[in-house]
Amino acid sequence: MHSRLNSRAWRGAMVAAAIATGAALAVAGRAVAQQQNFDNVEIDTVKVRDNVYMLVGAGGNTTVFTGSDGIMVVDTQFAPLSTKILSAIRAISDGPIRYIVNTHVHGDHIGGNESISKAGHFRAGGNVVGDLGAAATATAAIIAHENVLKRLSADPPAGQPQVPFAAWPTETYITKKREFLFNGEAVQIIHEPDAHTDGDSLVFFRKADVLATGDLFTTVMYPFIDAANGGTIDGYINALNAIMDITVASNVNEGGTMVIPGHGRLSDEQDVTEYRNMATIVRDRIKEYVKRGMTLEQVKAKKPTLDFDPRYGSDSGIWTTSMFVETIYKQMVAANPPTKPTQSKNQPKSSGK
């Protein structure tokens, strides 16, 4: 894809993606949002295809899907940007916001859940009436994998704020895929386990042929493997392969399935292919070094990411190239522990003297 938005937006997205690591990531967006100034952040709107749009601000990219049934929002960025996000949505459509889908647990993707859900309302079935029906339809439904709810409902790390109950998913799924009809289009929400986190979802709009990936694919950094929240490099590569199974190229050129990344520019299958190849090559290099018995320092000295650093590397911030390499190294060591040398049958035993 040659389509580009301004570099300010992408730099802001990259910073937002690297807010925190470990267990604190689920609530970090809220804590950092209290310290950052979002007054100067602008929300850029990109029409992707048909009635699907991408909103770019200071957190993860937001997807907006509109139609006769209402509006579906995929990821909600940071809480302080909620008013701006809502204004951008209203510039697209004044229809009711029915659904929010969270691709994973991180604060730069769920921060606006509470405000945006309260601005919408869910259309419940006819068997939900009275006070219960009113409660059930008072806000937009928030959909995510069950593991997202488990992470959000757990006690937060010491010193971190609890994500408000109103921002938690109201509907979860535990199967590989959840699919339903909305705005006359089949929408598929697909779980990719143990990848960026343990609760990642892809959201595929079949008729429009648009896929929102969350942080299972970005264009601005190395894969963010949140090991503390269940992420693994092998699962991440599996997820990229799953994305490629869904997407279709247009005559091996630009076009075909449009891919909305968690951070970065609008993409297509070729972009995902390049990213998958990079992740696989780096993983395999480090795996080979581990098999040779190299230490972490020796692996870093080999610079296994050297040819990809100009595009994805970073020496500063929370998610650096060094941290990417170290995370893969630790997971490869855990998967391939060194074996104790076996004693030859013909080797004489020590007399102990």
Per-region residue spans from a language model:
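Bacterial N-terminal signal peptides that target proteins for export
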Residues: 2-18
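Accessory terminal helices/loops
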Residues: 4, 26-34, 125, 249-256, ...
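Conserved beta-strand hairpin/beta-sheet module of binuclear metal-dependent hydrolase folds
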Residues: 42-92, 201-215
